[in-house]
C-alpha cells in the first residue's frame, strides 16, 4: 500500500492527477494511508517488521511516547512468572513469535477456514528447590492474521474488527450542584484500566470523604492514616486547607492499624477483622500490579493532570498520586485557579479545571491490536489457574512446560472474540467505500463501552474536540446516532490511543510547512486558524485579525501574532465518505449525513463510471480500500489475460498478479477485476493494473452521470418519486450483477447415509435435464424458482410391509419407497444463471466438512438485475427516491437539440431539504460534459486556477469540500461552455433551458434546470423485497402463517385492518381471512382440496387461536366450555390431532415450502 501512496502522477494511477481541480488552497499534506488505523495496530500486536521499522524511525526522531514492546510480548511479560502457592517453582514466558500461515487467503475463503498462523512462545520452568531449569518452545494455538486490506478471514468469511471509543483511564474532577443548597459539590475519581475505582468528594459540610471500590463513603483522613501518614504529616501536607483540618478534627482514629481495621469494617461489614487481612485488602485494591493496572495511558493522564513526574511503567497508584488528587480537589473547592506541579522535570503552573467526559482528551481508541490483546490476556489468566493446579498435582520430577500448559482457554478466548464479539463484524463489501468506511469506524458500543439505552444526548452530540478527529457528519440514523462515528480524513492514533490531527505550525505570524500532530488536550492550549485564512506570498496572514478556534469551540478574531497553528486542509474535519460529496458546504448537515451513508449502499454497476464532478478524494479512497490492483514495483507488462497479469520487473525477475473474476461479496454483489494494461506497457510502482468493483481507472465510481431535469411530470414524481427513461433499461446503464450462494450437505443420518444423486424418486425427466451424472446442475444453466440445483435423497424409516407388497418388491426390485427427495431447489423469487459449482468430499481429505458430513456442494447463481420500478436511487447529497415510472424515451422531455433527458426529479425536493449542493453539482456537471473556454479576464474568473480556464468536453473536474468552485464561477462558466455545431449554447448563466414535451413536441411554459448529476443505484432493490405466498409454513403454537420474506410468510391482517372490514360490513371476507386463510387447520386443507378439484368452498371451522384463548383461560382456573347452537358442549381437538387428521384424511400437506414431488412426505 505504501508504494501506491507515493506513486508518480500519471492519469492511470488513481490519484487526482487526471481531474481538473477548482481548489484555491494547495494541500501541504497528502491524505495518509486510510487503513493505517487497522494495519498499524495489528502490526504492533504481533511485532511485525513494519512496526519495528516505525519504532526505529520514531526513536531516531526523538519520540519518547512509542511502545517499545509488541502487544504479545507485553501480555506474556505481564503473566510471567506463574508461581505455585508455596513459591517453590515458577513458569515464565518469553519471545512469542508466529510461524508461516497454514493456508493462503484464497484457500481459506474457498475451504471455509480461518486465515491464521501458529503462535509459539518460549516457556521456562524453574524449580527453586533444586535450581533445575527446563526450557521448551510451546505451541499456543492458531492466531488469526490480518490481511493487507485490514480484514480477518474467519471460517471463510471476511470480517472487520471495529475500533472502540472508550473513556480513558486517569483522574477526573467533577462539579455538581447540591440539590438543597446552592453550593457546588466537587468530586474526583481515579479510574484504572482494570481494578477498583477510588473516589473522593467534598460534601456540603466541607467534609472530604473517600469511596473505595464504589462502597460506603469514609473519612479521607482515616484513608490517609491507613496509607501510613500521621495526623501531623496530614496537617503538614495540607497546611491552611480548612476542609481537611475540619475532617481531621472529627476523626478519632490515631494509628495506621486502627485506620486499616476501620476501613475493613466498612468494606466487609460483619466479618472478623485481622490486621493482616485489613492491610492486604487495601494493598490488593490499589497497590498490587496483578489486581490494579492504570496502563501507560492512565499513568500519562495522571501525570499531566496532577503535575507529577512518574515513569509511564508505574502502573499502580502511589501515595503521592493520592495526595496530589486530594490537593487538586480541595484547591478546586476553594475556587483557586492555579496549582504548582512538575512536568518533564520542570516546575509548571497547572490550570485548575473540572473535566468534560465527552472531550476527546478523555476518550481514547481501543484499536484492533488492543482489543485482541485484552482477549488473549483473558485467555492467559484462565490458563494461569490451570497451570497452578497442575503444579500442585503433578510429580515435580516429571514436570515440563508442555505438561503444565493447556492452550485451550487461550484458543477459546480468541475464537470467542472473533466469532461473537459485538466489535468483530461481518464486513460490509457492498462497494470499496463501504469496506473502507467499515474499517475506519469508531464505535462507543461493545464490551467496556456504552449501551444504546444508557447513552444520553451529551455523549452522542458533536463536541468541539471532534474537529479533525471524528467526522461530525457521518453517523448512522436511528438508535446508534452519535455512538458510531468515522475517523476524519487526516487523523491518526498515537501510542496512547488518543486521536491526533495535523496542524501547520505558525512561527511569529509566518505559516511554516512544519506539521505537528496534536491530541485534543494539547490543542486546548493553542489558538488554531482555519485552512482558508488568506495568506500573502511569503506565507504571512494577509489580514491583521485572524479567525481562530480557542478552547471551548467558539470562534473569535485575534491579532495575527497570537496564532499558534493553522489547519492543513479544509477537508480536515470530515471523513472519507463525507469528503466525497461535492459542494458539501451548500448542504444541510442532516442531508449530508444521509448522502455519506447512502454512498456506502451503492451497488457496483455493470460498467462503472467515475463522476464528472468529484472532489479529488476518489483516487485515495479507491486505492486505499484495496479493491484496485496496483503494481508493487515498476516494470513492463509481459503477459495479460482476464485472470492473470505478469510483469517483468526492472530489478529482474517477474511478478504475477491474480485477478478475481465474478466472486460473490459478503453482500451478494459481484466482485470482479477488469484489466487496464496491455502487454508491452511500461508500468510504474503504484500504478493501477486492474479496476475492481465500482472503480474506473483507479478512481471510485459508485454510480452514473445522468442528464437530469428538475420539473414535475404529471404528478408521477410527487414526494421524491423518480421518473426514468427507458433508455437506461435498454442500455443496461443501471444494471448490476448479483450472486447468490446455495449449499447442501450430504450427512450420515440414523437411518443411513444421505446421497447426492440424479436418481430421484417421482421426478420427471424434464426437471433433471440440466443435472449432470452426479446430480449436480451444470454451469451455464438458466434456473427458475423450484428448479433442482443438487439432487439428494435421504433414507426413510421402513414401515411394516404386507405380504403382497413384499412380493411386488421382490419381483420389481422396487427401491424408490425407501428414500425421500430432499434436493436443493431454487428458492421463491430467485432466478439466474449457474456460474460456479464447488464440491467438497470427505474422502478427498477435506476433513474440515465437520462431523457426519460426507459431501458438500456449493452452487453460485448470478443474476443481472436491470433497473425497474420500485428500485431506490440517490444522489450524493441525501436526495433519495424510488422509481415510480419508466417512460418510453420518446415521451421524455428533450432539449432544443433533440437530446432526451434521462431522469426527471421533483424540484420541490430541494427547498425544504436545503441540500442545494445537488443543483450546483448539476450545473457544473453540464459544464464539465460540454467543455469550456474562458475568453478575456472577467472578474468572476480572477480566482480560477490557470489550468482551469479551458477544458475539452467530458473533462472530469474536482471541487474539494469547503474549497470548491464558487457560485459566480459556475454562472460564468455556463456562459463560456463550448457551443453546439449550430453555434448555440443550450444552457446560459441561469442554468435553465427550454425543454420540449416528448409527447406533444410543444415547449414547456417555463425554463427548466437541466444538467448532469451523479446518481447511485442503492442496495434496496425491489426484487429482494417483493414477495408472495400461496401456502407455506405455520407457527407451531397459533398455527397462523409465519411473517416475513425469509420465512416465506404471509401478510399480517391486524387489528385495524379488521376494524376496516367491520366498518364496511364485509362479513364473509372477514370470516375467510380469520379462519381458512389463517389458522382453521382442517378448513384450509379442505379449501385447498376444493380449489384443486374445482368444487365449492365449504363452511369454515373453528380457528386455532380460539382454542389457544380457551386454553389460556383454563390455565387461569376458569372453566370455559364451547356450546353449539342446541346447547351441546363441543369438544375441541388438540392441534396435533387436527394436523394429523387433515393429512390422513385428505392426503395433503400444505405447510411445506414446495409442493413435494412425493406424497410420502405427508
From Swiss-Prot:
Role according to the record: DNA-dependent RNA polymerase catalyzes the transcription of DNA into RNA using the four ribonucleoside triphosphates as substrates.
SUPFAM superfamilies per record: beta and beta-prime subunits of DNA dependent RNA-polymerase (SSF64484)
Protein name: DNA-directed RNA polymerase subunit beta
Keyword vocabulary terms for this entry: DNA-directed RNA polymerase, Nucleotidyltransferase, Transcription, Transferase
Short name of one Pfam family: RNA_pol_Rpb2_2
PROSITE patterns associated with the record: RNA_POL_BETA (PS01166)
GO molecular function, one term: ribonucleoside binding
Classification via Gene3D superfamilies: 2.40.50.100, 2.40.50.150, 3.90.1100.10, DNA-directed RNA polymerase, beta subunit, external 1 domain, DNA-directed RNA polymerase, subunit 2, domain 6, RNA polymerase alpha subunit dimerisation domain, RNA polymerase Rpb2, domain 2
EC number(s) per entry: 2.7.7.6
EC primary class: transferase
Cysteine disulfide links: none
GO cellular component: DNA-directed RNA polymerase complex
One of the GO BP terms on file: DNA-templated transcription
Quaternary structure note: The RNAP catalytic core consists of 2 alpha, 1 beta, 1 beta' and 1 omega subunit. When a sigma factor is associated with the core the holoenzyme is formed, which can initiate transcription.
Catalytic activity: RNA(n) + a ribonucleoside 5'-triphosphate = RNA(n+1) + diphosphate
Family membership noted in the UniProt record: Belongs to the RNA polymerase beta chain family.
InterPro entries for this protein: DNA-dir_RNA_pol_bsu_ext_1_sf, DNA-dir_RNA_pol_bsu_external_1, DNA-dir_RNA_pol_su2, DNA-dir_RNAP_su2_dom, DNA-dir_RNAP_su2_hyb_sf, RNA_pol_bsu_bac, RNA_pol_bsu_CS, RNA_pol_bsu_protrusion
Amino acid at each position: 500500500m505504501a508504494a501506491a501512496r507515493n506513486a508518480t502522477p500519471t492519469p492511470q494511477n488513481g490519484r487526482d492527477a487526471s481531474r481538473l481541480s477548482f481548489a484555491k488552497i494547495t494541500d501541504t499534506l497528502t491524505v495518509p494511508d486510510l487503513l493505517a488505523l487497522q494495519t498499524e495496530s495489528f502490526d504492533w500486536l504481533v511485532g511485525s517488521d513494519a512496526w519495528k521499522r516505525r519504532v526505529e524511525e520514531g526513536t531516531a526522531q526523538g519520540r519518547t511516547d512509542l511502545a517499545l514492546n509488541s502487544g504479545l510480548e507485553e501480555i506474556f511479560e505481564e503473566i510471567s512468572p506463574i508461581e505455585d502457592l508455596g513459591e517453590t517453582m515458577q513458569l515464565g514466558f518469553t519471545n512469542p513469535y508466529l510461524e508461516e500461515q497454514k493456508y493462503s487467503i484464497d484457500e481459506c475463503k474457498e475451504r471455509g477456514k480461518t486465515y491464521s498462523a501458529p503462535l509459539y512462545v518460549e516457556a521456562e520452568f524453574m524449580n527453586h528447590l533444586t535450581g533445575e531449569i527446563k526450557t521448551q518452545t510451546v505451541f499456543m494455538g492458531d492466531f488469526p492474521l490480518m490481511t493487507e486490506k485490514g480484514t480477518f478471514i474467519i471460517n471463510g468469511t471476511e470480517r472487520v474488527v471495529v475500533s472502540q471509543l472508550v473513556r480513558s483511564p486517569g483522574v477526573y474532577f467533577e462539579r455538581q450542584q447540591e440539590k438543597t443548597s446552592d453550593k457546588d459539590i466537587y468530586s474526583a475519581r481515579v479510574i484504572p484500566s482494570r481494578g477498583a475505582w477510588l473516589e473522593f468528594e467534598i460534601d456540603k459540610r466541607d467534609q472530604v470523604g473517600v469511596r473505595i471500590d464504589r462502597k460506603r463513603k469514609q473519612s479521607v483522613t482515616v484513608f490517609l492514616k491507613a496509607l501510613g501518614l500521621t495526623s501531623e504529616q496530614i496537617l503538614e501536607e495540607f497546611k491552611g486547607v480548612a476542609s481537611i483540618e475540619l475532617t481531621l478534627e472529627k476523626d478519632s482514629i490515631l494509628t495506621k492499624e486502627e485506620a486499616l481495621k476501620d476501613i475493613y469494617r466498612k468494606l466487609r461489614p460483619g466479618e472478623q477483622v485481622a490486621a493482616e487481612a485489613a492491610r492486604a485488602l487495601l494493598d490488593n485494591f490499589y497497590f498490587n500490579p496483578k489486581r490494579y493496572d492504570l496502563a501507560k495511558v492512565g499513568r500519562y493522564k495522571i501525570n499531566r493532570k496532577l503535575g507529577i513526574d512518574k515513569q509511564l511503567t508505574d502502573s499502580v497508584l502511589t501515595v503521592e498520586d493520592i495526595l496530589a488528587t486530594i490537593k487538586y480537589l480541595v484547591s478546586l473547592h476553594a475556587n483557586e485557579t492555579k496549582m504548582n506541579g512538575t512536568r518533564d522535570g520542570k516546575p509548571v503552573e497547572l490550570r485548575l479545571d473540572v473535566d468534560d467526559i465527552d472531550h476527546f482528551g478523555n476518550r481514547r481508541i481501543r484499536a484492533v491490536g488492543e482489543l485482541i490483546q485484552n482477549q488473549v490476556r483473558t485467555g492467559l489468566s484462565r490458563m494461569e489457574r490451570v497451570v497452578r493446579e497442575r503444579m500442585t498435582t503433578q510429580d515435580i520430577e516429571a514436570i515440563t512446560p508442555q505438561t503444565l500448559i493447556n492452550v485451550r482457554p487461550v484458543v477459546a478466548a480468541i475464537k470467542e472474540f472473533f466469532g461473537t464479539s459485538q466489535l468483530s463484524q461481518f464486513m460490509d463489501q457492498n462497494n470499496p467505500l463501504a469496506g473502507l468506511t467499515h474499517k475506519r469506524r469508531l464505535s462507543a458500543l461493545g464490551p467496556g463501552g456504552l449501551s444504546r439505552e444508557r447513552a444520553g444526548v451529551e455523549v452522542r452530540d458533536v463536541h468541539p474536540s471532534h474537529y479533525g478527529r471524528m467526522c461530525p457528519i457521518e453517523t448512522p440514523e436511528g438508535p446508534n446516532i452519535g455512538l458510531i462515528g468515522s475517523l476524519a480524513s487526516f487523523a491518526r492514533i498515537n501510542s496512547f490511543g488518543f486521536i491526533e490531527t495535523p496542524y501547520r505550525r505558525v512561527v511569529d505570524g509566518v505559516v511554516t510547512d512544519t506539521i505537528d500532530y496534536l491530541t485534543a488536550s494539547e490543542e486546548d492550549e493553542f489558538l488554531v486558524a482555519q485552512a482558508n485564512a488568506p495568506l500573502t506570498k511569503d506565507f504571512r496572514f494577509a489580514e491583521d485579525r485572524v479567525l481562530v478556534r480557542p478552547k471551548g469551540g467558539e470562534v473569535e478574531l485575534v491579532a495575527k501574532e497570537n496564532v499558534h497553528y493553522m489547519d492543513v486542509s479544509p477537508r480536515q474535519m470530515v471523513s472519507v465518505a463525507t469528503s466525497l460529496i461535492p459542494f458539501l458546504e451548500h448542504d444541510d448537515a442532516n442531508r449530508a449525513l444521509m448522502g455519506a451513508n447512502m454512498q456506502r449502499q451503492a451497488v457496483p454497476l455493470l460498467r462503472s463510471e467515475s463522476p464528472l464532478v468529484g472532489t479529488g478524494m476518489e483516487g485515495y479512497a479507491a486505492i486505499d480500500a484495496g479493491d484496485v490492483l496496483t503494481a508493487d514495483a515498476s516494470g513492463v507488462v509481459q503477459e495479460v489475460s482476464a485472470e492473470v497479469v505478469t510483469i517483468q520487473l526492472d530489478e529482474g525477475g517477474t511478478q504475477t498478479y491474480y485477478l478475481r473474476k465474478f466472486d460473490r461479496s459478503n453482500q451478494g454483489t459481484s466482485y470482479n477485476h477488469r484489466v487496464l494494461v496491455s502487454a508491452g506497457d511500461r508500468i510504474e510502482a503504484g500504478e493501477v493494473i486492474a479496476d475492481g468493483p465500482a472503480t474506473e481507472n483507479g478512481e471510485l465510481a459508485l454510480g452514473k452521470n445522468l442528464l437530469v431535469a428538475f420539473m414535475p411530470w404529471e404528478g408521477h414524481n410527487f414526494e421524491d418519486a423518480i421518473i426514468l427513461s427507458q433508455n437506461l433499461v435498454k442500455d443496461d446503464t443501471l444494471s448490476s450483477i448479483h450472486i447468490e450462494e446455495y449449499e447442501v450437505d450430504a450427512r450420515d443420518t440414523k437411518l443411513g447415509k444421505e446421497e447426492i444423486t440424479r436418481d430421484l424418486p417421482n421426478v420427471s425427466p424434464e426437471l433433471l435435464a440440466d443435472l449432470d451424472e452426479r446430480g449436480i446442475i451444470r454451469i451455464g444453466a438458466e434456473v427458475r424458482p423450484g428448479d433442482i440445483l443438487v439432487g439428494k435423497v435421504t433414507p426413510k424409516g421402513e414401515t411394516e410391509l404386507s405380504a403382497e407388497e413384499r412380493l411386488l418388491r421382490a419381483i420389481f426390485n422396487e427401491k424408490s419407497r425407501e428414500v425421500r427427495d430432499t434436493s436443493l431447489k431454487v428458492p421463491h423469487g430467485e432466478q439466474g444463471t449457474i456460474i460456479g459449482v464447488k464440491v467438497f468430499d470427505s474422502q478427498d481429505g477435506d476433513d474440515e466438512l465437520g462431523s457426519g458430513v460426507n459431501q458438500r456442494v456449493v452452487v453460485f447463481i448470478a443474476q443481472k438485475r436491470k433497473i425497474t420500478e420500485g428500485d431506490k436511487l440517490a444522489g450524493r447529497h441525501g436526495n433519495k427516491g424510488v422509481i415510480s415510472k419508466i417512460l418510453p424515451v420518446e415521451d421524455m422531455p428533450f432539449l432544443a437539440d433533440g437530446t432526451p433527458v434521462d431522469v426527471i426529479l421533483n424540484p420541490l425536493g430541494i427547498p425544504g431539504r436545503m441540500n442545494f449542493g445537488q443543483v450546483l453539482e448539476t450545473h457544473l456537471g453540464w459544464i464539465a460534459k460540454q467543455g469550456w473556454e474562458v475568453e478575456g479576464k472577467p472578474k468572476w474568473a480572477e480566482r480560477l486556477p490557470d489550468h482551469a480556464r479551458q477544458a475539452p468536453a467530458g473533462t472530469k473536474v474536482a471541487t474539494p469540500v469547503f474549497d470548491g468552485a464558487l457560485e459566480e464561477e459556475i454562472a460564468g462558466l455556463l456562459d463560456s461552455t463550448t457551443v453546439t455545431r449550430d453555434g448555440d449554447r443550450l444552457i446560459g448563466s441561469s442554468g435553465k433551458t427550454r425543454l420540449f414535451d416528448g409527447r406533444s413536441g410543444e415547449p414547456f411554459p417555463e425554463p427548466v434546470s437541466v444538467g448532469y448529476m451523479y446518481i447511485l443505484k442503492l442496495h434496496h432493490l425491489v426484487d429482494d423485497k417483493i414477495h408472495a405466498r400461496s401456502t407455506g409454513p405455520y407457527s407451531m403454537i397459533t398455527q397462523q402463517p409465519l411473517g416475513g420474506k425469509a420465512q416465506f410468510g404471509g401478510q399480517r391482517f391486524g387489528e385495524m385492518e379488521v376494524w376496516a372490514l367491520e366498518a364496511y360490513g364485509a362479513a364473509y371476507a372477514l370470516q375467510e381471512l380469520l379462519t381458512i386463510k389463517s389458522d382453521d387447520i382442517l378448513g384450509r386443507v379442505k379449501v385447498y382440496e376444493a380449489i384443486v378439484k374445482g368444487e365449492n368452498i365449504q363452511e369454515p371451522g373453528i380457528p386455532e387461536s380460539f382454542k389457544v384463548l380457551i386454553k389460556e383461560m383454563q390455565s387461569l382456573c376458569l372453566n370455559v366450555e364451547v356450546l353449539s347452537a342446541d346447547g351441546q358442549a363441543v369438544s375441541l381437538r388438540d392441534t396435533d390431532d387436527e394436523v394429523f387428521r387433515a393429512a390422513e384424511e385428505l392426503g395433503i400437506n400444505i405447510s411445506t415450502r414446495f409442493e413435494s414431488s412425493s406424497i410420502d412426505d405427508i
